[in-house]
Amino acid sequence: METAALVAISISRLLVSFTGYALYTAFGQPSEQLRDPFEEHED
């Protein structure tokens, strides 16, 4: 494969991995530990 194709595939995989990790953190098991500032300061 050409170098440009390998670089493009690597960057794409990195972005997909980061997006997957962000979704897991936001909606998966670790989301229970996140604080909600709107719930802390109810009026």
Curated annotation (Swiss-Prot):
GO BP terms in the entry: photosynthesis
Pfam families linked to this entry: PsbN
TM spans (from-to): 5-27
Entry annotated with the keyword Chaperone: no
Cell location: Plastid, Chloroplast thylakoid membrane
Gene Ontology cellular component terms for the protein in this record: chloroplast thylakoid membrane
Keyword field: Chloroplast, Membrane, Plastid, Thylakoid, Transmembrane, Transmembrane helix
Coarse class of the protein's main subcellular location: plastid
Protein function: May play a role in photosystem I and II biogenesis.
Family as reported in the entry's similarity comment: Belongs to the PsbN family.
Listed name of the protein: Protein PsbN
Lineage: Eukaryota, Viridiplantae, Streptophyta, Embryophyta, Tracheophyta
